[in-house]
């Protein structure tokens, strides 16, 4: 591989004074660092393959090549710092097997015509979302990026078996698990409004929660202008399915306090909740 700029190219840049020598050296070092990271990732993957062969667990060549392709996709969408923190990006056969089994369970329920509001569908969707939260390290920005990667990379479906239909089924079943709880707190009119509008802006939540996490990490004051803007965005999104009546909102708050399930698969941590309550 070419290690950045050639000496002739460097001389040409200096002669034309396009870049200073320190700038050229910085560019060279950045290029070499990127190449070293690429080589290091390939080395790690080859070590995993060698260990599998040494233990007598000869991997299927096609599966291994698919894994390499999947890792290349992660490299395109995540920085090195993000990859180091993202469990999904790690070479972990146990995790991969757990996701294959979850995916097969969903396929079985779908093939049998199991409705999304059935107990088994809601339980499976909850397990899926809890695992997803765990394997994104509880960071909603990773979830947002994974969703974008899944939509933009056709190979993702081939590599993981997670089709748009599966995602839609899980999303609906998980929502039904929340709606079933709220039905115990809301009257018929309130529940009808929530059910009608719950899915309207569902896809906006991960990006907003990611912004809340970022605000907490960066120490943004809840009462600052940017903190207040985030709080207003959260309230607007919440009221899009909860409505604006104070008595109804109080019922939602009571449910959130008394029903731990409502916090599952939300990527909302105690720290983020505390920050939001102060805003």
Model-predicted regions and their roles:
Residues 2-279:
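Amphipathic alpha-helical "stalk" segments
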């Amino acid at each position: 591989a070419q290690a950045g700029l050639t000496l002739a190219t460097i001389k040409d840049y200096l002669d034309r004074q396009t870049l200073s020598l320190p700038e050229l050296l910085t560019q060279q070092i950045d290029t070499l660092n990127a190449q070293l990271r690429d080589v290091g990732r390939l080395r790690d993957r080859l070590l995993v393959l060698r260990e599998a062969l040494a233990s007598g667990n000869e991997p299927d060549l096609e599966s291994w090549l698919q894994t390499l392709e999947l890792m290349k996709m992660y490299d395109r969408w995540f920085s090195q710092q993000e990859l180091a923190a993202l469990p999904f990006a790690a070479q972990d056969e146990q995790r991969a097997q757990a996701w294959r089994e979850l995916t097969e369970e969903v396929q079985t329920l779908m093939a049998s015509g199991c409705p999304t509001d059935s107990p088994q569908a809601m339980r499976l969707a909850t397990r899926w979302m809890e695992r997803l939260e765990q394997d994104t390290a509880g960071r909603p920005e990773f979830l947002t990026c994974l969703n974008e990667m899944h939509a933009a990379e056709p190979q993702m479906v081939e590599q993981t078996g997670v089709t748009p239909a599966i995602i839609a089924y899980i999303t609906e079943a998980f929502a039904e698990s929340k709606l079933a709880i709220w039905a115990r707190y809301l009257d018929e009119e309130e529940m009808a409004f929530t059910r009608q509008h719950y899915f309207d802006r569902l896809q906006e939540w991960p990006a907003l929660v990611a912004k809340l996490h970022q605000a907490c990490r960066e120490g943004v004051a809840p009462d600052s202008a940017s903190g207040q803007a985030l709080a207003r965005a959260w309230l607007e999104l919440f009221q899009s399915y909860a409505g604006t009546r104070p008595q109804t909102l109080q019922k939602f708050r009571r449910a959130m306090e008394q029903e731990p399930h409502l916090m599952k698969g939300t990527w909302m941590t105690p720290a983020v909740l505390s920050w939001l309550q102060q805003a």
